Amino acid sequence: MEMLYNDSKERQVRSVSNLGLNNLMKETYSALSSVFGEKLDEVWLYGSYARGDFDAESDIDIMALVDLPKEQLAMYRRKVSDLSSDLDLKYDVLLSIKLQDKDTFLRFSNTLPFFQNVMKEGKRVVQ
């Protein structure tokens, strides 16, 4: 359900409807695929949007698991930040895209609380 309201500065703030979220996730997946190609392993939606308890101030948390060494991921951060900004403006939301190397995620997914939370509450995005 799309929620609209005006704050004290008469600035419109909104959250994304289910249809808008699906479109945003498809477009995010496609954009990440264009950056990483076959090295993009999985994309996960996690946090309040995955749990369904988001509000108008919530950001949209996304984790991209990439089959590259973590040292190489640094080269892609600017490009991913730019695509995130483009999608922020298009959908009038705040995306928070975390790049994560697949090896570290797999190695620590049973021990690190953050990774456990992504696995427990997250939703895997499929193209």
Model segments located where?
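Short beta-strand->loop micro-motif that forms the acidic, two-metal-ion catalytic signature
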Residues: D61-L65
